[in-house]
Amino acid sequence: MVEIDPFEMAVKQLERAAQYMDISEEALEWLKKPMRIVEVSVPIEMDDGSVKVFTGFRVQHNWARGPTKGGIRWHPAETLSTVKALATWMTWKVAVVDLPYGGGKGGIIVNPKELSEREQERLARAYIRAVYDVIGPWTDIPAPDVYTNPKIMGWMMDEYETIMRRKGPAFGVITGKPLSIGGSLGRGTATAQGAIFTIREAAKALGIDLKGKKIAVQGYGNAGYYTAKLAKEQLGMTVVAVSDSRGGIYNPDGLDPDEVLKWKREHGSVKDFPGATNITNEELLELEVDVLAPAAIEEVITEKNADNIKAKIVAEVANGPVTPEADDILREKGILQIPDFLCNAGGVTVSYFEWVQNINGYYWTEEEVREKLDKKMTKAFWEVYNTHKDKNIHMRDAAYVVAVSRVYQAMKDRGWVKK
């Protein structure tokens, strides 16, 4: 795999899209840099009485369109470059689906598997104490991400509320919370559900009837599992392959996503699932399928393997699974890509719905959430697809044009840039 600096990749994608826009050089230079970067030391007492200091980040890329929004990642290999890149991509993600937000992202360099639950709670609360003055319902709204979850969001929300002495709508400071403290119905499946809506619309654009067509899903975490499950249940597709970090499985007659999940929980991996053939993650990407959904990690489709991709639609459920060089190859092959910050925007869209519900103190049914998400994702897909057709440019570039144009307009209307 080619090692590419994540933030350099984000800037490269922006520069590429700028070729198709009438955007001033000063605005472009501004958009290449986050507006705020916070690095903090997060000391906590460990269960054995010792004190350990962790490094944390919070990056706010651009708030021209509203408060910044983005998850908090706990990962042993977390880097500032990754957090900056993800905050930048969040700006485009919230803009492409027309949410009144900017992009943010947070992270802590930690292996949470090495912490007890009590240590995790201390870390969550200590992080909020370190960054509370730069977050808030009207400023920057975190959410769960890699190795963080609703329970951790609950602790963080409670710590923020304690510090602020319960002034204002504290529930709205963080999304992805447990239902009992302001969480939203539909949040758990939101990323995958949004991706399914875009896959459905992409098939319409290509004139493909998805019923009985084949899909392969790389990655079997929350997003990967629900993408497979909903593709089967809502679109009538045949799930022929799935994988996790240890490898994948293939059955041309179809897999039952629920049974595979049960197997993974019992055995730690999808590998060796009865009735399926073990395959590598690399082999999964190159299968003869109609839809390929990379839902795991960054940079899995590169210039080295892009020419071997056989899917008609590549739905980027993960962040950054296709490199810029591979983008060109896939387009030359006539493959329709649903770019990551459009395809996986369902999660942040339902996070926005959660925030709206928190601010108003009124909660929607799961069906209402799904209907509102469908409208948002469908509208966003066709805005991007029509831009792609009108300008004869790549779908990712089209998504950037739609998103960056909205941010650029907000910057001009605020008087930040004159042209």
UniProtKB/Swiss-Prot annotation:
Q: Does the keyword Secreted apply?
A: no
Q: Which InterPro entries match?
A: Aminoacid_DH-like_N_sf (IPR046346), GLPV_dehydrogenases (IPR053388), Glu/Leu/Phe/Val/Trp_DH (IPR006095), Glu/Leu/Phe/Val/Trp_DH_C (IPR006096), Glu/Leu/Phe/Val/Trp_DH_dimer (IPR006097), Glu/Leu/Phe/Val_DH_AS (IPR033524), Glu_DH (IPR014362), NAD(P)-bd_dom_sf (IPR036291)
Cysteine-cysteine disulfides:
none
Residues noted as binding NAD(+) in the record, renumbered to the chain: G219, Y220, G221, N222, A223, G224, Y225
Which key words tag this protein in UniProt?
A: NAD, NADP, Oxidoreductase
BP term (GO), one = glutamate catabolic process
The record places the active site at K105
State whether keyword Repressor applies: no
Q: Which protein is depicted?
A: Glutamate dehydrogenase
Native source organism of the sequence: Thermococcus profundus
